[in-house]
Swiss-Prot record:
Lineage: Eukaryota, Viridiplantae, Streptophyta, Embryophyta, Tracheophyta
Reactions catalysed: ATP + H2O = ADP + phosphate + H(+)
Keywords, ordered alphabetically: ATP-binding, Cytoplasm, Cytoskeleton, Hydrolase, Nucleotide-binding
Protein name: Actin-53
Database matches in InterPro entries: Actin (IPR004000), Actin/actin-like_CS (IPR020902), Actin_CS (IPR004001), ATPase_NBD (IPR043129)
SMART domains: ACTIN
Source species of the chain: Nicotiana tabacum
GO CC annotations on file: actin cytoskeleton; cytoplasm
PANTHER family per UniProt: ACTIN
EC number(s) per entry: 3.6.4.-
Major subcellular site: cytoplasm
Amino acid sequence: AGFAGDDAPRAVFPSIVGRPRYTGVMVGMGQKDAYVGDEAQSKRGILTLKYPIEHGIVSNWDDMEKIWHHTFYNELRVAPEEHPLLLTEAPLNPKANREKMTEIMFETFNVPAMYVAIQAVLSLYASGRTTGIVLDSGDGVSHTVPIYEGYALPHAILRLDLAGRDLTDYLMKILTERGYSFTTAAEREIVRDLKEKLAYVSLVFEQELETSKNSKDVEKSYELPDGQIITIGAERFRCPEVLFQPSFIGMEAVGIHETTYNSIMKCDVDIRKDLYGNVVLSGGSTMFPGITDRMSKEISALAPNSMKIKVVAPPERKYSVWIGGSILASLSTFQQ
């Protein structure tokens, strides 16, 4: 969250609401009945954590309202009734969801005006393009969204219910095979951090797997909050491999490379060349080192032989949806 015209968000925190598992015994400590974001994160040991956004779509409106309240009053410290607002939504977001979001903003927070933009379109703006296909992969959902001259092509948008949270869960599972046990919501956050710091995408998975069996080059150590040090090896690239091979977690879906290709194939034959030449990665789950080359390689294998394929991974892609929103909301034409 932040202000239009800024080049980076002012506030970045996880969409979590935590409620105490125990009753407070010390009077006057000002214990709250709910904690949001980083505070919920830091007190996770005594809280039950809930995620009000599932697969990119709000599923718990009471908790979502708490998150918005926290954003306005604690993070940005603004009065919502004084500022027009730009919100974003997942592609193919149900209409009822958008209506509920609008209702809460106008009735609970009394915002003067608001606009809801599609996340992937904003990422494309942020990369300085108006035509391209965006693979947006965050925590709960991934989408491929072809955009031509600024218009998303809804018939060709594909959704994959596979993203960061699933990768974290899979990493928890394969770490268990190594003898490290992570189970609680609090421990999942530790594994998420481990994933963000150490995971990478291999160029040729089978080859990397063979190499890792015979050498220790892949191994890295990681210090847990209690000081214990764990070692992870092949798990580093086995984890994000799920994006390319969802069958690893028992999903029947095709990987992100094939989803991108299928999305392009649903578009008019005349615009495919422009899409192949502008594949834009966006979202936190595209931050793995090696993902750009791998996407390039995999899409080239599917596309016609002579096709020029360019996969673009802007360094700020973790926040490119926000940056695109900041650009859009600061245009004078938009404000009118």
